[in-house]
Regions:
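The feature marks the mature, well-folded catalytic cores of soluble enzymes
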Residues: 1-406
Length: 406
């Protein structure tokens, strides 16, 4: 394994991955804040943790080093001055309603041991947890019935989205929604102050502070020359253009392929409808088999992004991009339309490839799993009755840091 960030494919043997073990943040979910916190349901924490632990153990059993958001963020904040700076930035990004509240929350959190503090900001800070303080703020009075000073971050177990390791660099994302934007701040501090992310030649392709939204579920590293990006509900054209300019101008990658996908929650990211499982095999949702519009981005001689539009079938596109004589598309749910919709909702297309032809999937997507098995793909199925309630699969729940080259 090469040191540091090294990720030039979707299918090379996975050596190291960043996860977040689902925690008390999901206990902050109630029906009235579903829209605010981007959930449709409430996972049962005890079972969700068991399922997530089973996921991590499958990875370890297959030679993957598993590291966690809480631990890696705590390493980055070991210096008390950096910890204090982070807290001030995090609290500001949380939009507390008054200076008095912000100061009280800062002192409450800053006194905690660092690892405990990181876990606490993820799970959320309730108003009744912070020592009382005097405030004559009208905004504070009006919002007094809302239970949190700092909202929980229940989406963080989908570690794919806040950032992506691409080649020998990191893309730290400006998330589409304010609810999730703070997640990438943790990754920003990892990059700046944790040597496992900041050391050596690790570069930065996009940053938390950039203005336009992009999320990691829309980024697929097809090979050492080509990165695919979804133009989706969560990723904008302006962000893709800036990302492409930075990546293509400072790396070995030669092109960015942009897939224009439906702007709906069911097709939230590119990896919910399309993932790579082997050199020439892909899981897909049937609705993207029809001719697609995509854009190919490259740099011109002046270092500016030029793009061309292509309309073709996914099969032809992948054959051309990957220089393959043929590719095989494995439909989520097979030819059964109801199974396809059901298993798409439960992320049947969202597989995590940990080696060529070996994938981690949810066991509940049995139709798709059987099809993968028949096509010669080794399926490592994990329980997902509770963790799937967040609308993300094994790929969503993982941020690969290091893979073997293929």
């Amino acid at each position: 394994m090469r040191p540091g960030i090294h990720n030039y494919s979707e299918i090379g043997k996975l050596n190291k991955v960043l996860l977040h073990r689902i925690g008390y943040e999901v206990e902050g979910l109630v029906p009235e804040n579903f829209a605010r916190l981007l959930f449709d349901d409430i996972p049962y924490l005890k079972i969700a943790q068991q399922e997530h632990d089973a996921f991590a153990q499958v990875l370890r059993d297959n030679g993957v080093e598993v590291v966690y958001y809480v631990d890696e963020t705590a390493k980055a904040l070991a210096n008390p001055e950096i910890k204090a700076k982070f807290l001030k930035e995090f609290i500001a990004a949380s939009h507390t309603n008054s200076k008095f509240a912000s100061e009280a929350v800062f002192h409450y959190l800053n006194e905690m041991p660092t690892k405990e503090m990181v876990a606490k900001i993820i799970s959320g800070v309730k108003k009744d947890e912070v020592p009382s303080f005097k405030s004559n703020s009208f905004a504070e009075f009006i919002s007094s019935s809302y239970p949190f000073y700092l909202d929980p971050m229940p989406n963080l177990y989908f570690t794919r989205d806040p950032g992506a390791c691409i080649g020998n660099g990191l893309s730290i994302h400006h998330m589409s929604t304010g609810t999730r934007r703070r997640e990438a701040l943790l990754l920003k501090y990892m990059y700046q102050h944790n040597e496992d992310f900041s050391g050596g030649e690790n570069r930065l392709w996009y940053d938390y502070d950039h203005d336009y939204a992009i999320e990691g579920g829309d980024v697929l590293v097809l090979n050492n020359e080509t990165v695919a990006v979804g133009l989706s509900q969560r990723t904008t054209a302006a962000a893709i253009e800036r990302f492409a300019r930075n990546l293509l101008g400072n790396s070995e990658f030669k092109r960015v392929i942009v897939f224009d996908i439906p702007k709906t929650r069911a097709f939230m990211h590119l990896d919910t409808v399309f993932t790579m499982v082997d050199y020439d095999k892909f899981t897909i949702h049937p609705e993207i088999e029809a001719p697609l519009q995509l854009f190919e981005m490259e740099l011109d001689r002046d270092g500016e992004v030029k793009y061309s539009s292509v309309t073709d079938t996914l099969t032809n596109i992948l054959k051309s991009v990957l220089n393959l004589p043929a590719v095989e598309l494995i439909r989520c749910g097979g030819d059964d339309k109801m199974a396809a919709q059901r298993e798409q909702w439960n992320d049947g297309s969202n597989t995590l490839c940990i080696a060529p032809g070996t994938v981690v999937t949810y066991e509940r997507n049995y139709v798709t799993n059987e099809l993968l098995d028949k096509k010669g793909v080794k399926v490592l199925a994990i329980p997902g009755a509770e963790i799937s309630r967040g609308r993300g699969g094994p790929r969503c729940m993982s941020c690969p840091i290091n893979r073997d080259d293929i």
